[in-house]
């Protein structure tokens, strides 16, 4: 169905709630778990984050698309969301870095999206009832029951191993640092000096994580999620990095086994997001599904040791259960929103992890010092003798 402004679309939730709006992306139907993200900026980074695989993302900021899109802001090689929900799409793109409009970008990448939705009402529903499945479809009366059934039948994130689906299929090297406006190369690329070799386990890694490691003197070998730990160790790394990623960490037994092998070695380990959860599982902790997760760039987190408060970028639907923790796990960070565990370290190993995203992209860089702590551990091992 269309009107003077284009094709009409409808979002149907699994509880039967309907939101009527307009199609702003590719034509068609999509279904996924509906979550909300509270970031004000960074919509292109959000939708290209592999951690959003299997999900339809609601952007709570009311005005989206005003700076267009460009290839430098992509956090991976493709868009990973199953759909997008916004309040209002900007009719123009105004930024000197813009290469194409956001709507064109969505259409070219075959992403179904809907605008003119009361995103505040939708967010309140998700906050009260928890994340639930939804279906975006052309707005026809006969489609309502179809969309409802699709939403009801869609698989929950619980029990889904999505990391192996979004991971790289081959081993590759990465030596590109951060992009600086008006500079063709990062300072480190000009120096051409790398102090450490890091094996990065790709469970859905974001490019800015790789760039921030390179900025600190690391040469990276990125490996698939299911890489045998013997292969990784044969690469003679100075450290192991466990990346972010989508889905439930509990089915990722291959990753848990690999991490347990690494923990037997005197090698520094740093995990982020899904990597944080996998390190916890490998160390004997438990994981639970959250009601609506943490998705946004304004989440306050307390550093336990110093009582310092940092504002962080977050994107996860599962969390480490802080109850019944093994004695060798120390909690280093906690959320000031809901008290959930945000960081941990192993007291008898050179291993630590953080639930949020210290690389931001989008979001604040308050937690970027965690990368510096990783470098400190690498120095401690490599140059102690």
Curated annotation (Swiss-Prot):
GO terms for biological process: 'de novo' pyrimidine nucleobase biosynthetic process; 'de novo' UMP biosynthetic process; glutamine metabolic process; L-arginine biosynthetic process. Residues 1-196 are annotated as: CPSase. The active site is at 273 (nucleophile), 357, 359. Keywords: Amino-acid biosynthesis, Arginine biosynthesis, ATP-binding, Glutamine amidotransferase, Ligase, Nucleotide-binding, Pyrimidine biosynthesis. The keyword Amino-acid biosynthesis applies. Its EC number is 6.3.5.5. L-glutamine binds at residues 51, 245, 247, 274, 277, 315, 318. The keyword Lipid metabolism does not apply. InterPro entries: Anth_synth/Amidotransfase, CarbamoylP_synth_ssu, CarbamoylP_synth_ssu_N, CarbP_synth_ssu_N_sf, Class_I_gatase-like, CPSase_GATase1, GATASE. Gene3D superfamilies: 3.40.50.880, Carbamoyl-phosphate synthase small subunit, N-terminal domain. Pathway: Amino-acid biosynthesis; L-arginine biosynthesis; carbamoyl phosphate from bicarbonate: step 1/1; Pyrimidine metabolism; UMP biosynthesis via de novo pathway; (S)-dihydroorotate from bicarbonate: step 1/3. It catalyses: hydrogencarbonate + L-glutamine + 2 ATP + H2O = carbamoyl phosphate + L-glutamate + 2 ADP + phosphate + 2 H(+). SMART domains: CPSase_sm_chain (SM01097). It holds the Pfam family GATase. GO terms for molecular function: ATP binding; carbamoyl-phosphate synthase (glutamine-hydrolyzing) activity; glutaminase activity. Residues 197-384 form the Glutamine amidotransferase type-1 domain. NCBIfam families: CPSaseIIsmall (TIGR01368), PRK12838.1 (NF009475). PANTHER family: CARBAMOYL-PHOSPHATE SYNTHASE SMALL CHAIN, MULTIFUNCTIONAL TRYPTOPHAN BIOSYNTHESIS PROTEIN-RELATED. Composed of two chains; the small (or glutamine) chain promotes the hydrolysis of glutamine to ammonia, which is used by the large (or ammonia) chain to synthesize carbamoyl phosphate. Tetramer of heterodimers (alpha,beta)4. Belongs to the CarA family. Small subunit of the glutamine-dependent carbamoyl phosphate synthetase (CPSase). CPSase catalyzes the formation of carbamoyl phosphate from the ammonia moiety of glutamine, carbonate, and phosphate donated by ATP, constituting the first step of 2 biosynthetic pathways, one leading to arginine and/or urea and the other to pyrimidine nucleotides. The small subunit (glutamine amidotransferase) binds and cleaves glutamine to supply the large subunit with the substrate ammonia. This is Carbamoyl phosphate synthase small chain. It comes from Buchnera aphidicola subsp. Schizaphis graminum (strain Sg). The lineage of its organism: Bacteria, Pseudomonadati, Pseudomonadota, Gammaproteobacteria, Enterobacterales.
């Amino acid at each position: 169905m269309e009107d003077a402004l284009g094709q009409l679309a409808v979002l149907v939730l699994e509880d039967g709630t309907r939101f009527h709006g307009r199609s702003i992306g590719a034509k068609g139907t999509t279904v996924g778990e509906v979550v909300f993200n509270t970031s004000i900026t960074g919509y292109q980074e959000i939708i290209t984050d592999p951690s959003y695989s299997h999900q339809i993302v609601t952007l709570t900021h009311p005005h989206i698309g005003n700076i267009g899109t460009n290839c430098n802001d992509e956090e991976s090689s493709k868009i990973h969301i199953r759909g997008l929900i916004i309040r209002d799409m900007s009719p123009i793109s105004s930024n000197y870095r813009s290469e194409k409009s956001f709507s064109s970008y969505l259409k070219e990448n075959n992403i179904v999206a809907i605008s003119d939705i009361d995103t505040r009402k939708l967010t309140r529903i998700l906050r009260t009832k928890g994340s639930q499945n939804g279906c975006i479809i052309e707005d026809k009366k006969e489609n309502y029951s179809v969309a409802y059934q699709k939403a009801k039948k869609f698989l929950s994130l619980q029990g889904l191993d999505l990391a192996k689906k979004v991971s790289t299929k081959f081993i590759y090297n990465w030596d590109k640092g951060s992009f600086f406006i008006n500079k063709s190369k990062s300072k480190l690329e000009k120096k051409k000096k790398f102090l450490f070799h890091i094996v990065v386990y790709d469970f859905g890694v974001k490019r800015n994580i790789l760039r921030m490691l390179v900025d600190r003197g690391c040469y990276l070998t990125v490996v698939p999620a299911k890489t045998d730990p013997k292969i990784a160790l044969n690469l003679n790394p100075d450290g192991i990095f466990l990346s972010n990623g989508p889905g439930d960490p509990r089915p990722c037994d291959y990753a848990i086994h690999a991490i347990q092998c690494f923990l037997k070695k005197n090698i520094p380990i740093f995990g982020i997001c899904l990597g944080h959860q996998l390190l916890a599982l490998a160390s004997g902790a438990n994981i639970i599904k959250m009601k609506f997760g943490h998705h946004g760039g304004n989440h306050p987190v307390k550093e336990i040791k110093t009582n310092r408060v940092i504002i962080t970028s977050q994107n996860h639907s599962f969390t480490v259960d802080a109850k019944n923790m093994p004695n060798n796990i120390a909690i280093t960070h906690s959320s000031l929103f809901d008290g959930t565990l945000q960081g941990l370290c192993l007291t008898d190993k050179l291993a630590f992890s953080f639930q949020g995203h210290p690389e931001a992209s989008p979001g604040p860089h308050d937690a970027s010092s965690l990368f510096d702590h990783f470098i400190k551990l690498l120095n401690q091992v490599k140059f102690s003798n």
